[in-house]
Design a protein with these regions (language model features):
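General beta-strand structural signal in soluble alpha/beta enzymes
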Residues: 103-104, 133-136, 162-163, 221
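N-terminal glycine-/serine-/threonine-rich beta1-alpha1-beta2 phosphate-ribose binding loop
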Residues: 1-97
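C-terminal helical cap and adjacent loop that interface with cofactors, partners, or active-site loops
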Residues: 271-331
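Active-site-lining helix/loop region of Rossmann-like oxidoreductase modules
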Residues: 10, 152-278, 295, 302, ...
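Rossmann-fold NAD(P)-binding glycine/threonine-rich loop
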Residues: 106-131
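Conserved active-site and cofactor/substrate-binding residues in soluble primary-metabolism enzymes
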Residues: 10, 14, 18, 71, ...
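ADP-ribose/adenylate-binding Rossmann-like module
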Residues: 82, 94-115
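Alpha-helical support elements that line or immediately flank enzyme active sites
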Residues: 142-154
Length: 331
């Protein structure tokens, strides 16, 4: 094994490309290959595809096996899909190839609430391979779970946790603006909601992680998603939104224990939503309130995924979460 950690970037969408760029600039990490099924990317130089401005002498491969036929690797940084039914086979493939995994798949961050059988399959595959899998990101992975859990370290008692995240999506990347429903009619928004493909992915995972880590049994989980409508015509670099159309969403999740509500998470992401901000309120002994004045989700997701690589390499085999690792830092 070389001194540098050899990384394969699996998925070259906007986040994957940003991760790859960050790997290239980080000391102690080496980008040895990339995978993407997009025929417009396959075969091209990675530096060109990720917008690096220079050649890396690596061609984008269509398959992981094609990468590993040319080089050895230690870790895969996986950035393809949010949903277990779409990414599980990819994760199993990576593990069977003998690589540790850091993934930005939201449903992998704490999957035992909604996907217990699939989580058990991934965990078993990781243990068979002697490798580690982590799902992380800014949210889930930090703002609404790892951060409030870390803050409870200075509490003698925790009665209730409330986290509110507000994102002004006007200057965010196009796929994110699309993800929150920008430019949709209310009817189209509701139809996509009914199909289970609208709304922020990861709130159930965050609620479950907080409950489980603090030793509470999650008796009931409830969530609501509603569109945020434009009161006037809006335009971004990616969308034109008419008055009355959707400019974003508000999603609220509630986790109840035997004594009532214990966790409340509010996620608001909309065009022209005002000041970005993340607020954690803990009721207990003592009461705490911490506000971050705007966490850029794209930058933070890239950072935490890359920063987690060393922790994952040192972790025992299996499917792990952010609460299982030593504190992830910028080194």
């Amino acid at each position: 094994m070389t001194d540098e950690i050899r990384i394969v970037q699996y998925g070259l969408g906007p986040i994957g490309a940003a991760v790859a760029r960050h790997i290239v600039e980080r000391e102690g990490l080496e980008l040895v290959g990339t995978v993407d099924i997009d025929p417009n990317k396959a075969g091209k130089d990675v530096g060109e595809v990720i917008g690096l401005g220079r050649s890396l002498g690596l061609a984008v491969a269509k398959t992981l096996s094609a990468v590993l036929s040319q080089t050895e690797a230690d870790v895969a940084l996986h950035t393809t899909s949010s949903y277990f039914d779409l990414f599980q086979s990819q994760v199993i493939e990576i593990l069977e190839a003998g690589l540790d995994i850091v993934s930005t798949a939201e449903e992998l961050s704490f999957p035992w609430l909604d996907h217990p059988e699939a989580a058990a399959e991934v965990d078993a595959a990781a243990r068979r391979a002697g490798k580690t899998v982590l799902g992380t990101g800014v949210n889930p992975g930090f703002i609404m779970d790892a951060l409030p859990l870390f803050l409870t370290a200075i509490c003698q008692r925790v009665d209730h946790i409330e986290v509110t995240r507000v994102i002004n999506a006007s200057k965010r990347r196009g796929p994110f603006q699309a993800k929150i429903g920008s430019g949709m009619t209310v009817e189209a928004f509701e139809a996509k909601m009914a199909a289970g493909r609208m709304g922020h992915v990861g709130l159930p995972e965050s609620v479950a992680m907080v409950f489980d880590t603090l030793g509470h049994k999650l008796v009931r989980y409830e969530s609501t998603v509603e569109p945020v409508l434009a009161e006037r015509d809006l335009k971004t670099d990616h969308f034109e939104v008419r008055a009355g159309q959707v400019r974003g969403l508000k999603q609220v999740a509630h986790g109840y224990g035997k004594d009532g509500e214990f966790v409340a998470l509010t996620f608001i992401a909309a065009l022209e939503a005002g000041q970005d901000g993340d607020t954690v309120k803990i009721s207990g002994k003592p009461d705490l309130e911490v506000t971050l004045k705007g966490t850029n989700g794209d930058i933070a997701t890239v950072a935490i995924a890359v920063n987690a690589v060393r922790r994952v390499q040192a972790a025992p085999p299996g499917l792990v979460t952010m609460r299982d690792l030593p504190i992830v830092t910028a080194r």
